[in-house]
Regions:
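Extracytoplasmic metal-acquisition and chelation regions
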Residues: 2-14, 18, 27-400
Length: 400
């Protein structure tokens, strides 16, 4: 984790002003997101990727003036940075989604609901990814600022952004889309069996492209700057440092994948999460080998055979499970098609990051893992990982 330089007491005062009741807030001269009187900014993050972005930006060392506490989906809290009793500024982060879980559905725990009801900032991915957002904010009475890290809340933004913003004026919370925005792509896949319409109008899995991750981090940084304007330069410098790593990650990924002839870059997965990744790196993304996300383990023999025939005709040499899916039917398809099944610890990180200690515990680690395993499975050569990304290098036991 990188160290955040110490915040000034003036910055702490700015954060403290964010904490006050409406009359006191006016006296402070602020009309922005509120926090508690102790100078604590309370944040909630929807996805595992966003939780990691914020963690990478906020984890200072013990000599800093910032105390940072992150509570995971399991309810366990980790402390980073300054001792809470000595810190002049405090940030708490509650992460909703668990590692190795779908990013689309989520049942809020009692503790998570309480955290969201008290939150100043709610960081979300957007593009209609999180189907649970409306129920979460409605049931908790959230009244802070929802920060849409992708810059696009959903399909309604694409249709008529002005009209959507007008509707949001009636909501009890604010919506901040930031200044950066991903270029959303239309959802390319047909409806699942038994459904009349596709699940999405636009692909919500924006983070699979490191370039889009840069957009998300930029908007997160802007929200932090608004929370502590006297420290805008400090937050901006930390965002710049992390973005520099993401750019190196992007360049490294391109170098590794370009070692594979483009006609060999054929990707079948167990979930349709890799559209943006594939577009950026010249991969032919066939989507999920089996379209039924929730019942893949129960695919019929006929369905297995049909899918295997499709895999064989595509020229694919491997099919890849994702960490958030049951790999049982993927294994069956691979066996019938005569190709490699990439599963278990080698599976790709798609909807979510991985558990502590896994390659995909962090966003950068997840991309290093995915690109390394894809490149090796396709017969390419993984380029040397840059020195400042080496701490996130995949384990040697991954795909050979």
């Amino acid at each position: 984790m990188r160290t955040i330089p110490s915040m000034s007491r003036r910055s702490a005062a700015a954060l403290a002003c964010l904490a006050l009741s409406a009359p006191a807030l006016a006296a402070c001269g602020h009309s922005s997101t509120s926090a508690d009187a102790a100078g604590t900014v309370k944040a909630v993050a929807s996805t595992t990727q966003i939780c990691d972005y914020i963690t990478q930006l906020a984890s200072g060392d013990a000599s800093s003036d910032l105390s940072f506490d992150r509570t995971g989906a399991d309810g366990k809290t980790q402390h980073f940075g300054a001792d809470a009793a000595k810190a002049t500024s405090h940030l708490t982060l509650t992460c909703l989604l668990a590692p190795n879980a779908s990013a689309h559905e989520h049942d809020m725990t009692t503790a998570q609901s309480k955290a969201l009801s008290e939150a100043d900032l709610f960081f979300v991915s957007g593009v209609d990814l999180e189907h649970f957002l409306d129920s979460a904010v409605d049931s908790t009475g959230f009244k802070g600022t929802m920060v849409v890290t992708s810059g696009v809340a959903g399909a309604a933004d694409v249709d008529d952004l002005a009209a959507q913003k007008k509707k949001e004026e009636a909501k009890p919370y604010k919506v901040d889309r930031g200044s950066a925005k991903v270029e959303v792509a239309k959802w390319p896949f047909p409806p699942e069996e038994g459904e009349s319409e596709p699940e999405f109008r636009f692909d919500p899995h924006v983070w699979t492209s490191p370039k889009n991750a840069i957009v998300q981090v930029t908007n997160i940084g802007a929200a932090l700057e608004k929370a502590a304007p006297d420290q805008a330069g400090v937050f901006r410098s930390h965002v710049d440092a992390y973005v520099a790593k993401l750019k190196k990650l992007d360049e490294w990924a391109a170098g590794s994948l370009n070692s594979v002839p483009q006609d060999k870059r054929v990707l079948f997965t167990s979930h349709d999460a890799f559209g943006y990744f594939s577009k950026e790196f010249g991969v032919k993304f066939e989507g999920a080998a089996l379209s039924d996300f929730n019942a893949q383990q129960d695919a019929t023999a006929d369905k297995i055979q049909q899918t295997a025939d499709k895999v064989k005709s595509s020229g694919a040499v491997a099919i890849f499970a994702e960490n958030s899916n049951n790999p049982k039917s993927i294994q069956k398809v691979a066996e019938v098609a005569g190709v490699k099944a990439v599963i278990g610890d080698e599976a790709l990180y798609g909807d979510s990051l991985g558990t502590p200690g896994s390659d995909g515990e962090t966003y950068i680690g997840s991309i290093l893992h995915n690109v390394s395993n894809l490149t090796k499975a396709w017969g390419g050569t993984v380029t040397e990982i840059p020195a400042d990304l080496a701490q996130w290098s995949p384990k040697a036991s991954d795909v050979k």
